[in-house]
Swiss-Prot record:
This is Plasma serine protease inhibitor. Residues 1-19 form the signal peptide. N-glycosylated; glycans consist of a mixture of sialylated bi- (including sialyl-Lewis X epitopes), tri- and tetra-antennary complex-type chains; affects the maximal heparin- and thrombomodulin-enhanced rates of thrombin inhibition. O-glycosylated; further modified with 2 sialic acid residues. Proteolytically cleaved at the N-terminus; inhibits slightly the heparin- and thrombomodulin-enhanced rates of thrombin inhibition. N- and O-glycosylated. Expressed strongly in the liver, and moderately in the kidney and testis, but not in other tissues tested. Belongs to the serpin family. The reactive center loop (RCL) extends out from the body of the protein and directs binding to the target protease. The protease cleaves the serpin at the reactive site within the RCL, establishing a covalent linkage between the carboxyl group of the serpin reactive site and the serine hydroxyl of the protease. The resulting inactive serpin-protease complex is highly stable. PANTHER family: PLASMA SERINE PROTEASE INHIBITOR, SERINE PROTEASE INHIBITOR, SERPIN. The keyword tRNA-binding does not apply. Its main location: secreted. Residues 20-24 form a propeptide. It holds the Pfam family Serpin.
Length: 404
């Protein structure tokens, strides 16, 4: 995998502000647990995936569970009353599911862990607040953002929309090594705060695919729609699991630096069954039980991106008030008439023979059994799922490749 970038952008403005529709997409030990982000967020992640898939059933999907959950956790710091309750319940924080304090402390540990320098991969992630200078921000909120979420803060004159847009876009471009430019298409001067969460990850395959083995082959978008794609080929030992319950094959292709990309190939016609089966226990099974065996693997090179207006999706998962006049964000500011006017999530991924630039995270190591079996041929020539995991416990990306 070569390139994957992610940004989650949250714009706060007056409650009466009009929603923008830019960038709209119709929508080696066994670890003790698999996590997508802070505790309690796993069901939310898979429910979010299904909501995105339902909105665009024949489209590519790619997003970062980590960044979305961290962004919502940050918002919960400043939310009050029912607004806070909706966010926490959406993330799975409720009776018997952990506390808000555990959510934020786990987020802090995660961010510090992921920012540890590593020789074999590049990782950059963080948070930033761009705030209107005269907006009275609660000191408790600013302090928590800096200490728990390691956020940078920048006073920004939103009354100069073009200047504010340039300032934010320049920051984003710098943090993503120039891979995402012009994230913000327009500002109208009504914004009082912009929250940005970014992640940039770059890693190489543990064993690169041979360029000379890549050839054009058919990819069946549907049984009736066939496109030609460059298909990579490699014979090697890969992590492998045949999941008979969900009628799919799972292949793990490792990166240098203790990260792995898992590719899930449903049996023909069974994609919906696999999507409906995405749960925490399913991921645990895939990560704990695969065998390492020799495969003749055919995997298409692909480049896809996802751009989502989360203010259109999250209400379907119970997180509604922050986008309406009912929003209570008085934990951010005593200015009572602010709400989230737009929440943009953007991710891009490119897969090729050498490796991946992607949004990412870090963690523990998986122990895999090694099977003495003959080489098996697996061809990813129809829609499949992909997830990127760091150290076997942080699920960084989740997506579906329908058309490479």
């Amino acid at each position: 995998m070569r390139l994957c970038l992610f940004l989650c952008l949250v714009l706060l403005g007056p409650r009466m502000a009009t929603l923008r529709r830019s960038q709209k997409k119709k929508i080696q030990e066994v670890p003790p647990a698999v996590t997508t982000a802070p505790p309690g967020s796993r069901d939310f992640v898979f429910d979010l995936y299904r909501a995105l898939a339902a909105a665009a059933p024949a489209q590519n999907i790619f997003f970062s569970p980590l960044s979305i959950t961290v962004s919502l956790a940050m918002l919960s710091l400043g939310a009050q009353s029912n607004t806070k309750a909706q966010i926490l319940e959406g993330l799975g924080i409720g009776p018997g599911e952990g506390s808000e304090e555990e959510l934020h402390s786990a987020s802090q540990r995660l961010l510090r862990e992921l920012q540890q320098p590593q020789d074999s991969l590049q990782l950059s992630l963080g948070n930033a607040l761009f705030t209107k200078p005269r907006l009275p921000i609660q000191e408790a909120f600013l302090g928590a953002m800096r200490t728990l979420y390691l956020a940078d803060t920048f006073p920004t004159n939103f009354e100069d929309p073009e200047g504010a847009k340039k300032k934010i876009n320049d920051y984003v471009a710098k943090q993503t090594k120039g891979k995402i430019v012009d994230l913000i298409k327009s500002l109208d001067g009504t914004q009082v705060m912009v929250m940005v969460n970014y992640i940039f990850f770059k890693a190489k395959w543990e064993t690169s695919f041979n360029l000379k083995s890549t050839h054009e082959q058919d990819f069946y978008v549907t049984p009736e729609t066939v496109v030609r794609v460059p298909m990579m080929k490699q014979q090697d030992q890969f992590y492998y699991l045949l999941d008979r319950n969900l009628s799919c094959k799972v292949v793990g292709v490792p990166y240098q630096g203790n990260a792995t990309a898992f590719f899930i190939l449903p049996r023909e016609g069974e994609m919906e069954q696999v999507e409906n089966g995405l749960k925490e226990k399913t991921l645990k099974k895939w990560l704990r039980m695969p065998m390492k065996r020799r495969l003749e693997l055919y995997l298409p090179k692909f480049s896809i991106e996802g751009s989502y207006q989360l203010e259109e999706v999250l209400p379907k998962l119970g997180i509604r008030d922050i986008f309406t006049s009912d929003a209570d964000l008085t934990g951010i500011s005593n200015h009572s008439s602010i709400r989230v006017s737009e929440m943009v999530h953007k991710a891009v991924v490119e897969v090729d023979e050498s490796g991946t630039q992607a949004a990412a995270a870090t963690g523990m190591v998986i122990t895999f059994k090694s099977a003495r079996l003959g080489s098996q041929r697996i061809v990813f020539n129809r829609p499949f799922l992909v997830l990127i995991v760091k150290n076997s416990k942080h699920i960084l990306f989740l997506g579906k490749v329908t058309r490479p």
